[in-house]
Each structure stands twice: as C-alpha cells, then as structure tokens.
C-alpha cells in the first residue's frame, strides 16, 4: 500500500476533528446525558416515593374509616341502650300510673258503693219506720226513731 501525503493530511485532519469534538462537543453531550439520567432517576425516585405515600395514605384512610365505623357503632349502641332505658322508664312510669288510676277507680267505686249503701240503709230504715208508723198508727218520738234507725243500720 502506498502511503502518501494525502493520507497523512487526512489523518491529521481527522485527529484535529476528534480532538475538537472531544474538547468542545463531547463534554456538553455528556453533561446533557448525565442531567437527563439524574432527572430520570429523580422522577423515578419521586414516583416511588409518591407510590409509597399513596399506599401509606390508603392504609391511614382505611384505618380512619374503620375507626369511624367503630365510633359510629359505639354511638348507635349507646343510643340503642339509652332508647331502651327510656322505654323501660316510660313503661315503668306508665305501669305505676295505670296502677294509681286503677286504685283510684277502685277507691272511688268503694266510696260510692258505701255512700249508696248508707243512703239505701237510711231509706230502708225510713221506709221501715214509716211502715211501722202506719201499722202501729201512731208516731214514735224522734229520739226513739233515731235509735231504731241506728240499730237497723247496724243490723243491715
């Protein structure tokens, strides 16, 4: 092979081109590539961090939901218990009131019955005295009438 001056000139020109590229072109390319790698690494790291935060938030949200459900159940249980207590209290009060009304009714009936019996005794005694006066044909004195009426009332 014949080496001539053109080949040496091309070799020198190529070497200068490579040196120029290594000095001025290559460093900005490497810098841009490294920046992109750093940006991609940061983005992946941020994405992983966001994914972890989302998972943590989901767990916290589920815990809060469970806690809220438990608290709601406690409130419902407390309200149910309070409702039952109120119902029992109202039923007991109603039962007491019912017994009081029944006793009051019985007392009124008894007093009315006694009043009617006493009235009936007095009328029967008065009728008996009136009948006896007619039979006897004379009037007995008032003190004797009252004494006889009291005895009849006591017997009835």
From Swiss-Prot:
The keyword Magnesium does not apply. It is a single-pass membrane protein. One of its GO terms (cellular component) is plasma membrane. Signal peptide: none annotated. Pfam families: ATP-synt_B (PF00430). Keywords: ATP synthesis, Cell inner membrane, Cell membrane, CF(0), Hydrogen ion transport, Ion transport, Membrane, Transmembrane, Transmembrane helix, Transport. The keyword Nucleotide-binding does not apply. The chain crosses the membrane at residues 7-26. GO terms for molecular function: proton-transporting ATP synthase activity, rotational mechanism; proton-transporting ATPase activity, rotational mechanism. It is found in: Cell inner membrane. Belongs to the ATPase B chain family. NCBIfam families: ATP_synt_b (TIGR01144), PRK05759.1-2 (NF004411), PRK05759.1-4 (NF004413). F-type ATPases have 2 components, F(1) - the catalytic core - and F(0) - the membrane proton channel. F(1) has five subunits: alpha(3), beta(3), gamma(1), delta(1), epsilon(1). F(0) has three main subunits: a(1), b(2) and c(10-14). The alpha and beta chains form an alternating ring which encloses part of the gamma chain. F(1) is attached to F(0) by a central stalk formed by the gamma and epsilon chains, while a peripheral stalk is formed by the delta and b chains. F(1)F(0) ATP synthase produces ATP from ADP in the presence of a proton or sodium gradient. F-type ATPases consist of two structural domains, F(1) containing the extramembraneous catalytic core and F(0) containing the membrane proton channel, linked together by a central stalk and a peripheral stalk. During catalysis, ATP synthesis in the catalytic domain of F(1) is coupled via a rotary mechanism of the central stalk subunits to proton translocation. Component of the F(0) channel, it forms part of the peripheral stalk, linking F(1) to F(0). This is ATP synthase subunit b. It comes from Haemophilus ducreyi (strain 35000HP / ATCC 700724). The gene is atpF.
């Amino acid at each position: 092979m014949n080496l001539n001056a053109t080949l040496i000139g091309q070799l020198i020109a190529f070497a200068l081109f490579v040196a120029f590229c290594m000095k001025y072109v290559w460093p900005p390319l490497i810098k841009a590539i490294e920046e992109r790698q750093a940006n991609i690494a940061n983005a992946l790291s941020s994405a992983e961090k966001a994914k972890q935060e989302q998972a943590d938030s989901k767990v916290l949200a589920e815990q809060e939901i469970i806690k809220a459900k438990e608290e709601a159940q406690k409130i419902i249980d407390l309200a149910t218990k309070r409702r039952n207590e109120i119902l029992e209290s109202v039923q007991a009060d109603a039962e007491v009131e019912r017994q009081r009304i029944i006793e009051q009714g019985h007392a009124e009936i008894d007093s009315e019955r006694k009043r009617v019996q006493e009235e009936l005794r007095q009328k029967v005694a008065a009728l008996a005295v009136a009948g006896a006066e007619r039979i006897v044909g004379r009037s007995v004195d008032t003190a004797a009438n009252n004494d006889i009426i009291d005895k009849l009332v006591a017997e009835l």
